[in-house]
Amino acid sequence: MAVISMKQLLEAGVHFGHQTRRWNPKMAKYIFTERNGIHVIDLQQTVKYADQAYDFIRDAAANDAIILFVGTKKQAAEAVKDEAERAGQYYINHRWLGGTLTNWSTIQKRVARLKEIKRMEEDGTFEVLPKKEVALLNKQRARLEKFLGGIEEMPRIPDVMYVVDPHKEQIAVKEAKKLGIPVVAMVDTNTDPDDIDVIIPSNDDAIRAVKLITAKMADAIIEGRQGEDSVESVEAELAATETQADSIEEIVEVVEGDNA
């Protein structure tokens, strides 16, 4: 049974791609049609590739892989953080700092500084420092937490990277590829899929779409680590038994109705 049903994908708007003038021709095989100047993603393929991504992530997690969630745009930031934490993994949901992976030793020094400032507050050092210095330290900590808080406890570079919108996260993807780290990603119709190891053709701009796909990747990690289905996965299977659009023709009807 598919990990994500056609009905769930439709309700989340996963089928809506970008305007046709913004497309990447390399995504042609994942596009079903065009309606009112918008490309419609072939959800039958999304179902298939989501299954493959789920299996890939689950198997990696079963082998104790470290998985880094990346999504820095506002539509993705909350889901990336929440689902990474739920799965016991790591995330970057604000600006990607160049060299996060390829210059890991420098990033580790910044993380060490973040931990040092936290210790200073906990052990009472802040109480004996001038207020101005404490204010500067708090400002530094806030900035470090914003960009590095999600990888503060990550012991080493990740084994797998999950990305929302690799078009926006091009630097992150390039660093991963340079280090041989496989990339699983939500890929919209405006993106070059060539650098993605496991592609999930999908709308990567709608909050509901991002939440749906990202939650399933977190479910895959939980299942891989626990060796059993998470509660969310079981609920998804039950939901998948409900009446749903079976054919791509029905999808087009829904799209036409939404765009009317």
Swiss-Prot record:
Keyword annotations from UniProtKB, A to Z: Ribonucleoprotein, Ribosomal protein
Coiled coil feature spans: none
Family: Belongs to the universal ribosomal protein uS2 family.
Signal peptide start and end residues: none
Gene that encodes it: rpsB
UniProt protein name: Small ribosomal subunit protein uS2
Domain of life of the source: Bacteria
GO cellular component: cytosolic small ribosomal subunit
Annotated source species: Streptococcus gordonii (strain Challis / ATCC 35105 / BCRC 15272 / CH1 / DL1 / V288)
UniProt cross-references to Gene3D superfamilies, sorted A to Z: Glucose-6-phosphate isomerase like protein, domain 1, Helix hairpin bin
Pfam family, one: Ribosomal_S2
PANTHER family assigned: 30S RIBOSOMAL PROTEIN S2 PROKARYOTIC AND ORGANELLAR, SMALL RIBOSOMAL SUBUNIT PROTEIN US2M
InterPro entries for the chain: Ribosomal_uS2, Ribosomal_uS2_bac/mit/plastid, Ribosomal_uS2_CS, Ribosomal_uS2_flav_dom_sf
BP GO annotations: translation
